[in-house]
UniProtKB/Swiss-Prot annotation:
Name of the featured protein: C5a anaphylatoxin chemotactic receptor 1
Function as written in the Swiss-Prot or TrEMBL entry: Receptor for the chemotactic and inflammatory peptide anaphylatoxin C5a. The ligand interacts with at least two sites on the receptor: a high-affinity site on the extracellular N-terminus, and a second site in the transmembrane region which activates downstream signaling events. Receptor activation stimulates chemotaxis, granule enzyme release, intracellular calcium release and superoxide anion production.
Annotated membrane topology: Multi-pass membrane protein
Gene3D superfamilies linked to this entry: Rhodopsin 7-helix transmembrane proteins
Region (Required for CHIPS binding): 10-18
Top-level taxon of origin: Eukaryota
Cytoplasmic-side positions: 65-69, 133-153, 227-242, 304-350
Compartments reported by the entry: Cell membrane; Cytoplasmic vesicle
Organism of origin: Homo sapiens (Human)
Effect of residue 16 to A: Strongly impairs C5a binding
Listed CDD domains: 7tmA_C5aR
PROSITE patterns per the UniProt record, alphabetical: G_PROTEIN_RECEP_F1_1, G_PROTEIN_RECEP_F1_2
Subunit structure: Homodimer. May also form higher-order oligomers. Interacts (when phosphorylated) with ARRB1 and ARRB2; the interaction is associated with internalization of C5aR. Interacts (via N-terminal domain) with S.aureus chemotaxis inhibitory protein (CHIPS); the interaction blocks the receptor and may thus inhibit the immune response.
Pfam families, per the entry: 7tm_1 (PF00001)
Length: 350
């Protein structure tokens, strides 16, 4: 979001009887941060601390396991996407503290705020890849046993990253810096040059490809997976399934406000009261979306073992227990054995 408002400033509150107060800004703006900005700063600080440390730990654990387990490859790429987004938080934090003044230049304006969109597309495409993997494990176990390998997983991740970069291009292209004089500061935002159709097209593509379509397809996918799992009364390998479902659910929860306000602002006039209200909430919506960058390590720890087990085990070993794939392999083999046994029984019956 962060679109520029090109409405003419209102100077109607000035008259020739006004006296100059050196302690008051000439445009009569307050030096106090708005409540949404303060909340955004608190969220940014927490997300940075938890996200950098948590995702760095996940990267460290899964990097050693990625050579032999496919689940580790999935979670490694998710953690890298979240970690890269968290690195931009100190810059965004500084900008909000300075009332959205951007002293970091045009290149940083194009790259750093766009990292959150890159994270959004990379995360949802990786989650879609993971979900397809879970679907095939349940419904095509023999195919998985024959063809599912680390090389194919890395290719799928590379495709997901490539598509994410492609979908983030509009944010890189349309982000510019603009200088204001009342008060004097430099702003970083999206400039569509008064082209509302282009702005709406970008917002619709972001909403459909980054939220609605994945929500529909993943809901259908996991509905079939859960129905099959319950019908078989399977107790093995439910840990990874629960972790993936929790990660998917958290993605849609934390990105919902950003998507809703973004699509609304693209269809509203910049001078409308609703647009101005949403613009004030922009930083808070971005910070809420950023929570998704630190929530995954927390999910992994909670999904580890019972409370006593978490006290007894070190954090790296706990994460390794959650993010490795041993139970998935057992599940695939168990499905394969059950399929072969069923085929053998049918052959004997004939």
């Amino acid at each position: 979001m962060d679109s520029f408002n090109y409405t003419t400033p209102d100077y109607g509150h000035y008259d020739d009887k006004d006296t100059l107060d050196l302690n008051t800004p000439v445009d009569k703006t307050s030096n106090t941060l708005r409540v949404p900005d303060i909340l955004a700063l608190v969220i940014f600080a927490v997300v940075f601390l938890v996200g950098v440390l948590g995702n760095a730990l996940v990267v460290w654990v899964t990097a050693f396991e990625a050579k032999r387990t496919i689940n580790a490859i999935w979670f490694l790429n998710l953690a890298v996407a979240d970690f890269l987004s968290c690195l931009a938080l100190p810059i965004l934090f500084t900008s909000i503290v300075q009332h959205h003044h951007w002293p970091f230049g045009g290149a940083a304006c194009s790259i750093l705020p766009s990292l959150i969109l890159l994270n959004m597309y990379a995360s949802i495409l990786l989650l879609a890849t993971i979900s397809a993997d879970r679907f095939l494990l349940v419904f095509k176990p023999i195919w998985c046993q024959n063809f599912r390998g680390a090389g194919l997983a890395w290719i799928a991740c590379a495709v997901a990253w490539g598509l994410a970069l492609l979908l983030t291009i509009p944010s890189f292209l349309y982000r510019v810096v603009r200088e204001e004089y009342f008060p004097p500061k430099v702003l970083c935002g999206v400039d569509y040059s008064h082209d509302k159709r282009r702005e709406r097209a970008v917002a619709i593509v972001r909403l459909v490809l980054g939220f609605l379509w994945p929500l529909l397809t993943l809901t259908i996918c996991y509905t079939f997976i859960l129905l099959r799992t319950w019908s078989r009364r399977a107790t093995r390998s439910t840990k990874t399934l629960k972790v993936v479902v929790a990660v998917v659910a958290s993605f849609f929860i934390f990105w919902l406000p950003y998507q809703v306000t973004g699509i609304m602002m693209s269809f509203l006039e910049p001078s409308s009261p609703t647009f101005l209200l949403l613009k004030k909430l922009d930083s808070l919506c971005v910070s809420f979306a950023y929570i998704n960058c630190c929530i995954n390590p927390i999910i992994y720890v909670v999904a580890g073992q019972g409370f006593q087990g978490r006290l007894r085990k070190s954090l790296p070993s706990l994460l390794r227990n959650v993010l490795t794939e041993e139970s998935v392999v057992r599940e695939s083999k168990s499905f394969t054995r059950s399929t072969v046994d069923t085929m053998a029984q049918k052959t004997q019956a004939v």
